[in-house]
Amino acid sequence: MRGIVYLSAGLIVGLMFATAPAAVASSMYASLSTPSTDDARPLVSPIPRETVPYDGPYAPGTIIINTSERRLYLILPSHQALRYGVGVGRPGFTWAGVTRIANKREWPDWTPPAQMLRRRPDLPRHMSGGIDNPLGARAMYLAGTLYRIHGSNEPDTIGQAVSSGCIRMTNQDVTDLYERARVGAKVVVLR
């Protein structure tokens, strides 16, 4: 009988330790877009998200990025759009065109492209997804390009031209957009 009690206790303790890493891993990102309270990074965009009137040619679900305004618009039904602040490509890294969302990822890994590594050999060759990853909480991959609409581990750069061509958003805003935008959605990038 004593052997069964020890065996049962051992199994319970073993299960506690076996599930602890999974619990820690899931709790690390449980708050999809909110850094810990000890983190000094701002939690909100310096440019608040808002619903604005829209009377243009694009259908609901279309994403319009106006890089000169540093704003992204998600077209809604009823002649409205959600407007978000974004960070855009710095001089020499701006672009314009029409594409679509090819893929979406939560807490994406980041592998800098070869061109970026040539410019910045100090960068890691690969970084797993997480709060310190430059892609932030979500990424929407733009078809036919190396660019993404993604979160950021530097939310204070929203409203600035600092990226290598990607469109940066706060983790809160990119999580909101990620839930609303579908794979295949049209993306129009204007200068």
At which residue positions do the language-model features occur?
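Exported/periplasmic cell-wall-interacting domains
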Residues: 78, 83, 92-98, 105-191
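Bacterial N-terminal signal peptides
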Residues: 8-18
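Cell wall/extracellular polymer interaction/catalysis modules
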Residues: 26-115, 129-131, 138-140
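Positively charged n-region of N-terminal signal peptides that target proteins for export
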Residues: 1-4
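Generic structural signal for beta-strand residues in well-ordered domains
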Residues: 16-18, 56, 65, 133, ...
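Sec/Tat signal peptide C-region and signal peptidase I cleavage site
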Residues: 19-25
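Short helix-onset patch at the extreme N-terminus, typifying the N->h transition
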Residues: 6-9, 31
